[in-house]
């Protein structure tokens, strides 16, 4: 009832509550279809009012619409509703769903019943509006009830949502129909109002303008909200916290923070929100819908607010200016946030940690740190984030999308902020200038950080150690050192960190991902900061300069570290041993020494390290990567510091000068070491021997001498070293890399020190002179070694045999003789060596490389020392002369060996038999005779040998390997020496000349053998048959005749040979290969020796003449065989029948008669032969080939011997013309006569086996 306590007055319901108004501009945006649709909707709204029983006068707008007139210029009348005589003038078809109509009626009745009006009911029989007067009192009650129930009298059947107005919008949502379409972009909408709003985007009209700032808006309501900003009026105040707000909506949102109310719940995941807009935004995560698309760059957004914020980027408009500092912003919210900087207020405080913030949003973000919640998860890799913005940024990593492109250089970026920063490079603008030094910056934040450098102010002080910092973040990071707290733990490996950023960086190690790639060199990095640091390498920029010495650095951190050098301050002290350090990082590394803890382990080799940086450096060893390359010489380094140190070599720059003596150095560390020389101080003393040192490092090195410890071991060969530097030098041996090249002669070296020494050769400068003999040297160390010659001092004595040496290195080499140890093994052939230098020399054999070439004859060598020795041959120089007999030698070693002849001294005596030897090597070989030991056994055939080298040579027989191949003819050899000899055949070079007869030879060994002819000395005698030989190898070959041993067996046919060379020749039979081809007639041969013999046919030369009868021959071997005719000697006797032969080959052929063995079989007809030559002859029958042609008459022959016989027809020569031989007959037919007496029939027919 009116006037009752608690009754609420309410204004009358008007037609405006259910109408939509248009301005002229808005109405013009609609096409004809949309205008007609508007008329239908407005008429429907009017009918709905009448349907609900609200008797209204017909407004002019409805009249206009019914008449088809435009509504925007009509004057609207407010029509007062009458008492609730509820009436409907419309038919059932007005409602698309009968249940929807019923539900609205039920809600009205239910609402009235709650208010105590049970007699109320909906009536459909009201004749006129006058009938409603009798119910005036009832209407008032209804009006009160409607107000009490928040005016929500319409309920939706689908979701039971209640509305205070009847809503066509709600109906359309359930139908899912989008009937309103935009002509410009074809986008569809549920409601007409949404389409109208959308159309404003295309026309971009802002007709409502703010008088204060001049900013324009599209709607009057937005302008009204905007005006509140200028008033500063905040009428909505919350009593609990005192916060005031300009808008009631903001006030309501804020209240929920205190109450914790989250009424808006997501049906998909159950998550609840304070605001419906947050729920709407959240729902798009599930749907992935991005309805707002930017026409400029194509980027899509889920919410209109984000879309509007984004659009400002393209216009670059910044209408909001700060009155304090003049800085402008795109959005007012950004200006509002900025203003707090000037006030310094931080009203939002966290009770947990006491930290205060200027904005509530920042506080909210901070609170997540305490909760540890990460609700935003990446679907690609599962990585979780605290904020959605971070997830958005992260997603770009997977897509690789870079939509933001620079118009200047075409470079693309994944985020607009990065593009914005990049653009400054092209403009070169640095608007933020430092008043102190004039340095300019791109951003104000960078300027603020820079200013602290000039003030020197460090307001953030550590309470534990007193260390001060410029920024609070640095102090926070520092504090973790004292507490030891590491709250951030890695789930993969369990490692803990002080800061979350460190954990984040660490996690990338497990993923192995490196999304940040350098465009210059293609190198990839796991973090953008590391990429930025790396990029400085390419630019070479060093912006951070030291004011003391002028040295420049790429990073400020390096400059900070450097500055301590000048101050000499060491504030970080070790509590265990009292040692002080300049930097806390150095102290931290040092502390590990006391704990011995090595937490960082290499996954490749299992090696552990004290800190992660050393592990990271170590890992490069396994990858072999050397990203830092010198532009001068191309040498690459694993670390940038090494490259920096190396560069000083090329520049020759030595900025660090000693004030005492003026000596300059490339690095400050070298100068620091040098200065100690002038002070004479040696504070570091050895407790073992009392020796003092100027540096602790020198003492540490010295101590190893007493302990004998060699902690640095080579992974390749197992060799151990006392110092890491020696190991580093040693490692180069395995790589064979020679990065240091001489510009004068092009020679390369492994180490720069070697190159430096070499360069002196070109300058011929010898600064270090000996006072005794006036001899000069290139280096001080060489002079010191030389001086020992004059003193005769040999301080290094062998404990085993008492032999003394001038240098420790020589003693070390000598000691291996007694141990017999050969730790250096060749991976190719298994051969072992006592010293790595010997192994290194040996390895060259397998590579076949010979970089050292003789300028005189072009001969190449694998080692420079070999070249030097060879060059003496051409010069003929023999600088080493024997004082006893005057004999001169080319090499000092030869003179030393020779001297023993005069002294007759044989210091090396055998304890078994008393036999003495001049050299220990000879004694060592001799001793094996007494032991009878042959410890080196072949696993293939069981044969045993005295030494490993002989075994290694023997093993090649079984493997059949011939690694040394001739580039000319393709022939392969087991040993390099054999290949060297062979090569001389192609070159025809014979540098070794006999002084007696002038004969030339390919190699020195052949010359040596030849010289014995002149002396007639045959020192090596056979014990079996008393035959003597010039050399030991010839004797060894001869002995096989008596033993009958044939160790070299053919795998194809089983034939055995006494010598490997014969087996090699034999093998060609099976392969059929003929690699040696005659250039004259194209005839091919299996062996080069055969080709050489053949070539004589074309030349017609016969240089080898018999002194007895004057007959000439093509080669020396034929002459040797011929000479036996004159002597009548037949040393080769058959054991079966006693028959003797002049040549071993004839004996071999003869033996076949007794064995009846025919190992050589024809593949065509199956016929077998005793000898391969017979098989070869036989094969011509099948081929019909006659390669030997007579030049006189053109007649061709199967064999060369037939051709030779034939040629005598033309010359009329008697082939067996023999002079001065009374025992032999001049006619070949008389030789036939001799066979009659012997009964011998050596010539057998291959077809019928008849002998002649």
UniProtKB/Swiss-Prot annotation:
Record's keyword terms, sorted: DNA-binding, Metal-binding, Nucleus, Repeat, Transcription, Transcription regulation, Zinc, Zinc-finger
Alphabetized SUPFAM superfamilies for the sequence: beta-beta-alpha zinc fingers (SSF57667), KRAB domain (Kruppel-associated box) (SSF109640)
Gene Ontology terms for molecular function: DNA binding; zinc ion binding
Organism superkingdom: Eukaryota
SMART domains: KRAB (SM00349), ZnF_C2H2 (SM00355)
ZnF C2H2-type span: 180-202, 208-230, 236-258, 264-286, 292-314, 320-342, 348-370, 376-398, 404-426, 432-454, 460-482, 488-510, 516-538, 544-566, 572-594, 600-622, 628-650, 656-678, 684-706, 712-734, 740-762, 768-790, 796-818, 824-846, 852-874, 880-902, 908-930, 936-958, 964-986, 992-1014, 1020-1042, 1048-1070, 1076-1098, 1104-1126, 1132-1154, 1160-1182, 1188-1210
Gene Ontology terms describing biological process: regulation of transcription by RNA polymerase II
Domain KRAB: 13-84
Coiled coil: none
PROSITE patterns cross-referenced by the UniProt entry: KRAB, ZINC_FINGER_C2H2_1, ZINC_FINGER_C2H2_2
GO CC annotation: nucleus
Compartments where found: Nucleus
The family this protein is said to belong to: Belongs to the krueppel C2H2-type zinc-finger protein family.
Protein's job: May be involved in transcriptional regulation.
Protein name: Zinc finger protein 729
Lineage of the species this protein comes from: Eukaryota, Metazoa, Chordata, Craniata, Vertebrata
